Curated annotation (Swiss-Prot):
It holds the Pfam family DUF776. This is Oxidative stress-responsive serine-rich protein 1. It comes from Rattus norvegicus. The gene is Oser1. GO terms for biological process: cellular response to hydrogen peroxide. GO terms for cellular component: nucleus. Keywords: Phosphoprotein.
Length: 291
């Protein structure tokens, strides 16, 4: 009877150990056969303790393997396969933007500080600036709430005396600029004339705006006069255009061909080559597509 009971205990212990998952980090329980019913009870309690853990544990943590819990939530973008460079638009860096005070400080100073210097003109310079830059504020006592436009103040600047320009070069605060004034490139470039350059003492790296030449495409105004044979050709084509004997009007391409000159076409082609980045070599796939 005792041996049968022991065999039954061994079988139950073996089945319990098969069902039980023992962690590698946990303590390994060594059981001897002759410990009796107390061992059996303790094994049962451990089985009951660990069973819900294994049932509730997610499948990601089985066998020490870590799997992504969120599958398609965030996907990493692949590298670009084509080796062509990414062309970014050019960034225009102004010379002294780092030292300029914030607009809120400008507003507070223009409202609170006492005004001196130019009472008649409506432009006044504040007494002290930490950055050494000047801005115009409104003379509230004399001119009310009227803001002078940018161009008038720009026109007045060269008429001032040179000492005044050197000491207090008046500039327009960004609050008084409207969209019309900012659209004019020349007036915007006049804003930075009185500001000191950041790189003092070194070789000046940054070009000033007002020294720069602006390219303006004025619509072929400076085209040289045509050769006499061309002029006669043009007159002949215009006379053809005016008289309608056949009754059928000419095609659009013929009408356009009259007014286009070879010189202008060459000029425009050079302009395109100079200002646009056109890669010389095509990629292999593009060559295969076009051939």
């Amino acid at each position: 009877m005792k041996s049968e009971a022991k065999d039954g205990e061994e079988e139950s212990l073996q089945t319990a150990f098969k069902k039980l998952r023992v962690d590698a980090s946990g303590s390994i329980v060594s059981l001897s056969v002759g410990e009796g019913t107390s061992v059996r009870a303790s094994v049962r309690t451990t089985v009951d303790d660990t069973k819900p853990k294994t049932m509730c544990a997610p499948k990601d943590s089985w066998h020490g393997s870590t799997r992504k819990s969120s599958r398609g939530a965030v996907r990493i973008q692949r590298r670009r396969r084509s080796k062509s460079p990414v062309l970014h638009p050019p960034k225009f860096i102004h010379c002294s933007t780092t030292a300029s005070p914030s607009s809120s400080q400008l507003k507070q100073r223009s409202q609170t500080e006492p005004l001196d210097g130019s009472s008649g003109r409506g432009i006044s310079t504040p007494k002290e600036f930490s950055t050494g830059e000047n801005s115009t504020s409104l003379d509230i006592n004399h001119t009310g709430a009227a803001i002078e436009p940018l161009r008038s103040s720009v026109l007045r600047l060269p008429s001032e005396s040179k000492t005044e320009e050197l000491s207090d070069a008046t500039q327009v605060s960004p609050e008084s600029l409207t969209a019309n004034d900012l659209s004019d490139f020349q007036s915007v470039s006049k804003l930075s004339q009185g500001k000191p350059c950041v790189c003092v003492g070194k070789a000046c790296q940054c070009k000033r705006w007002h020294d720069m030449e602006v390219y303006s495409f004025s619509g072929l105004q400076n085209v040289p006069p045509l050769a006499p044979e061309r002029r006669s050709l043009e007159d002949y084509s215009q006379s053809l255009h005016t008289r309608t004997l056949s009754g059928s009007p000419r095609s659009c391409s013929e009408q356009a061909r009259v007014y286009v000159d070879d010189v202008t076409i060459e000029d425009l082609a050079g302009y395109m080559e100079y200002y646009l980045y056109i890669p010389k070599k095509m990629s292999h796939m593009a060559e295969m597509m076009y051939t």
